[in-house]
Structure formats: C-alpha cells, structure tokens
C-alpha cells in the first residue's frame, strides 16, 4: 500500500454533506450549514480532498474541517466516519483495524492523548 495517495478523493463535498445529513437524521437532529464555517470548510475540502497525501495528513485535514464547524451538529462524527471508511479500505486484521479507526477518530475529534497520536503516527509511518 502506498503511503502517499489520494485517500480522501472519493469523498466530494456533496458526500460529506450527505454523511452529516444521515447522522443528523438518525438522531432527529437539525442538519443545517453554519453561516461562519460552511463556505470556508467547503472551499478547503474541495481544494484539498483529491490531493495525494499521507494518511496522517488526511486525518489532519478531517480534524481541521471538524474544527471549522461547517454544520450545526455532528461535525466530529461526520469527519471521523469519513476517515474510518478510508481506514476500512486498508483491509487490516479486525482488531488492528478497530484500533487504528479508533485512534484516527480520536485525533479527528480532538480528544486523542499524546500517546494515541504517537501510536497513530507510528502506524502511518509503517505503511509502505
């Protein structure tokens, strides 16, 4: 598996928006763009998501977009679920896959400890 590739290329902004809408619908929550963060986040995503980057850079882009709060609710869940789908494509053994998805999700949500961040970065460095 190539360490640098367009990990997020399949996820257009329309797909990001649909993912947020599904997460909101599942909880009967308001799905609506924010006035401050939506347009700038969409621009960032559309300019970067198709680029080749390392997996940890893809996680960082998702974290950045989460922090920009493009939607009223479930920003963290939206971008965490996207990176989880990317990691599922790595076809890792089940336990390792769950650990890597959990680490990435914590990083995107901004709740990862230094140890979790270090473990994830080491995993990313191990990709050939």
Regions found by a protein language model. Name each.
Residues 1-128:
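FIC/Doc superfamily catalytic core
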């Amino acid at each position: 598996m190539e360490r640098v590739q367009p990990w997020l290329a399949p996820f257009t902004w329309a797909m990001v928006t649909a993912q947020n809408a599904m997460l909101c619908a599942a909880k009967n929550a308001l799905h609506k763009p924010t006035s401050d963060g939506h347009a700038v986040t969409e621009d960032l995503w559309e300019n970067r998501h198709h680029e080749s980057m390392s997996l940890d850079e893809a996680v960082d882009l998702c974290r950045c977009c989460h922090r920009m709060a493009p939607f009223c609710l479930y920003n963290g869940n939206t971008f965490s679920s996207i990176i989880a789908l990317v990691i599922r494509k790595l076809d890792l053994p089940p336990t390792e896959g769950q650990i890597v998805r959990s680490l990435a999700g914590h990083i995107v949500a901004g709740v990862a400890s230094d140890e979790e961040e270090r473990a994830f970065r080491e995993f990313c460095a191990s990709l050939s």
